[in-house]
């Protein structure tokens, strides 16, 4: 919350025919994290990257892996992603059945030496986080409905970032707040960073840019300006 701005490009938007080239580009850009979207075709209407991909990605880069699990029954698969090399794991609170499951997920991630995070869809009330906020390293606020890249930012998502920041100020001032969906240096970065976001996920905004390295730097600089 209001910490150093971190950029976490979404690898789902990379050129998979030139994958290692894009990884080296992210390293050259000084990206802080690599965002890995895992979708199962059930929790969200798309099917994407899985455990073997995370393991192979971990083998070719030292950039920390920010793994976002958009899957049903995440407790069943969570150990696989922890073993594969995730450095930070976000689980959707909507995919967990009750308080016991939420706490078990956080404990499992923490016990593996990995940083735990909870993710929220745009229609999930922020106050559901209150019992867990002190046990988390990060909250992921979705500013689009998860499932497909390239969507437009949902207006007012910055208000939800502010609500998370208010909880963090009371219970966990070191909490990171990540925002994913329609993030652009020209417009939405300022909105979310003014409210407390400090981790920015961008897919097409980085990989489809004429100069992806400059795009990463522009996101970081726009966030710093908004925080000033």
Q: Where in this protein do the model-derived segments appear?
A:
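A short, acidic/glycine-rich surface segment
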Residues: 124-128
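Active-site/ligand-binding-proximal alpha/beta "capping" segment
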Residues: 138, 145, 153-199
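Conserved N-terminal beta1-alpha1 strand-loop-helix module at the mouth
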Residues: 1-90, 95-104, 108-110, 115-116, ...
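Short gly/ser/thr-rich secondary-structure transition/capping motifs
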Residues: 119-123
């Amino acid at each position: 919350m209001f910490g150093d701005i971190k950029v976490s490009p979404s690898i789902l938007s990379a050129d998979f025919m030139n994958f290692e080239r894009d990884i080296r580009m992210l390293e050259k850009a000084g990206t802080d994290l690599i965002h890995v979207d895992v979708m199962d075709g059930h929790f969200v209407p798309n099917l994407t990257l899985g455990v073997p991909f995370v393991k192979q990605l971990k083998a070719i880069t030292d950039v920390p892996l920010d793994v976002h699990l958009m899957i049903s029954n995440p407790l069943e698969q969570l150990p696989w992603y922890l073993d594969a090399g995730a450095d930070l794991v976000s689980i959707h609170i909507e995919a967990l059945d009750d308080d016991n499951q939420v706490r078990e997920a956080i404990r499992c991630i923490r016990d593996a030496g990995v940083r735990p995070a909870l993710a929220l869809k745009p229609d999930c009330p922020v106050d559901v986080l209150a019992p867990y906020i002190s046990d988390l390293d990060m909250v992921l606020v979705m500013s689009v409905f998860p499932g497909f890249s390239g969507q437009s930012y949902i207006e007012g998502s910055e208000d939800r970032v502010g609500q998370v920041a208010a909880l963090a100020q009371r219970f966990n001032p070191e909490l990171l707040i990540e925002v994913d969906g329609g993030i652009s240096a020209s417009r939405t970065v300022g909105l979310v960073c003014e409210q407390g976001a400090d981790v920015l996920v961008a897919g097409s905004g980085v990989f489809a840019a004429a100069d992806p390295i400059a795009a990463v730097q522009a996101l970081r600089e726009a966030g710093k300006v908004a925080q000033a």
